[in-house]
Amino acid sequence: MSKRDYYEVLGLSKGASKDEIKKAYRRLAKKYHPDVSKEENAIEKFKEVQEAYEVLSDDQKRAQYDQFGHAGANQGFGGFGGGGDFGGGFGFEDIFSSFFGGGGGRRRDPNAPRQGADLQYQVTLEFEEAIFGKELNVEIPVEDPCDTCKGSGAKPGTSKETCKHCSGSGQVSVEQNTPFGRIVNRQACSHCSGTGQMIKEKCTTCHGSGKVRKRKKINVKIPAGIDNGQQIRVSGKGEAGVNGGPAGDLYVVVHVRSHEFFEREGDHIICEMPLTFAQMALGAEVEVPTVHGKVKLKIPAGTQTGTEFRLKGKGAPNVRGYGQGDQYVVVRVVVPTKLTSHQKDLLREFAGQEEQDDSLFGKLKRAFKGE
């Protein structure tokens, strides 16, 4: 069975504003919620409304849907069909609770293991360090399990007790009278903060949190060829996990300082090489600096300013190991600002000989004179 158009589901046109989408969703969600509606197929209709709102209320998902239809909306966002929770971790009971207050709906077990938070660290490298890679020892602030209480939060020699108010479930039932009748919501127990356990005697080191703030030294290997703005993931070096869950990850964001001579374009290195008029006109062999050392470059006679030469394999290594970039040398003629009398005489003599040459410049001069 094919899906209905999301705009049609909410009774809207494609140009509907965000506010119109939200109002339509609230109205239809109340109408079809299974706890209230007695209509046939209310659950399916509610899910359909919820699915449409999940896509159209998000600018990125809506743009994908407008361009590609249901195929675009379901690509890269984990899908929306069925009766499970969305990627944000809430079900339709949780959404409905926003209309009536409380915190009803299905909740995650507060004592289940959870991964720790990810951390981000910024580093600045010199141009050459980014080309060849480097090992760094960084010191970052992290929250680690308290050594005194082993992360329990309870004073050594004591243990946590089951919360008497929620019987260890971490949730309590709250009844509310609404225009639709009496609604029973499940919400986090305020006495144990939803953990289902109480700490009678708190650890004096961490004050019951089970964590302490530390500065941790971590060795980070910067791969050769990394570029400005790229990041490195160091697995398991983020914040400590909760309830025995795995630690988060550390993301090292790299910034590369600019170089006075070199520029970078992907894996290639670009530089400009100043040459004299004589070197360009007569040809020469010059030394060009590269990050790998100086190399000799032959300049053919008659080379024009702006000509680009390629030095194969003298660029940056690809950060993923796919070969090596090149270096491109752009030559520029340098016009001297101070000349001796002898140099001026030589140039005047050269200019006089050029006028006799039927070159492009000669043709241009005649054109301006109307010849």
From Swiss-Prot:
Positions with a binding annotation for Zn(2+) 2: 163, 166, 189, 192
Cofactor stoichiometry and binding remark: Binds 2 Zn(2+) ions per monomer.
One GO term of the biological process aspect: response to heat
Zinc finger boundaries on the chain: CR-type: 133-215
Record-given protein name: Chaperone protein DnaJ
Family the entry assigns: Belongs to the DnaJ family.
SMART domains: DnaJ
Cofactor dependency: Zn(2+)
Record remark on domains: The J domain is necessary and sufficient to stimulate DnaK ATPase activity. Zinc center 1 plays an important role in the autonomous, DnaK-independent chaperone activity of DnaJ. Zinc center 2 is essential for interaction with DnaK and for DnaJ activity.
Gene Ontology CC terms: cytoplasm
A UniProt-annotated Pfam family: DnaJ
This protein's record includes keyword Zinc-finger: yes
MF annotations from Gene Ontology: ATP binding; heat shock protein binding; unfolded protein binding; zinc ion binding
UniProt: Zn(2+) 1 binding residues: 146, 149, 203, 206
Protein keywords: Chaperone, Cytoplasm, DNA replication, Metal-binding, Repeat, Stress response, Zinc, Zinc-finger
Keyword Repeat among UniProt keywords: yes
Residue ranges occupied by any J domain in the UniProt entry: 5-69
NCBIfam families assigned to the protein according to its UniProt record, in alphabetical order: DnaJ_bact (TIGR02349), PRK10767.1 (NF008035), PRK14280.1 (NF010873)
Assembly mode: Homodimer.
Chain positions of CXXCXGXG motif repeats: 146-153, 163-170, 189-196, 203-210
Gene encoding the protein: dnaJ
InterPro entries: DnaJ, DnaJ_C, DnaJ_domain, DnaJ_domain_CS, HSP40/DnaJ_pept-bd, HSP_DnaJ_Cys-rich_dom, HSP_DnaJ_Cys-rich_dom_sf, J_dom_sf
Cellular localisation: Cytoplasm
Physiological role: Participates actively in the response to hyperosmotic and heat shock by preventing the aggregation of stress-denatured proteins and by disaggregating proteins, also in an autonomous, DnaK-independent fashion. Unfolded proteins bind initially to DnaJ; upon interaction with the DnaJ-bound protein, DnaK hydrolyzes its bound ATP, resulting in the formation of a stable complex. GrpE releases ADP from DnaK; ATP binding to DnaK triggers the release of the substrate protein, thus completing the reaction cycle.
Native species: Bacillus anthracis
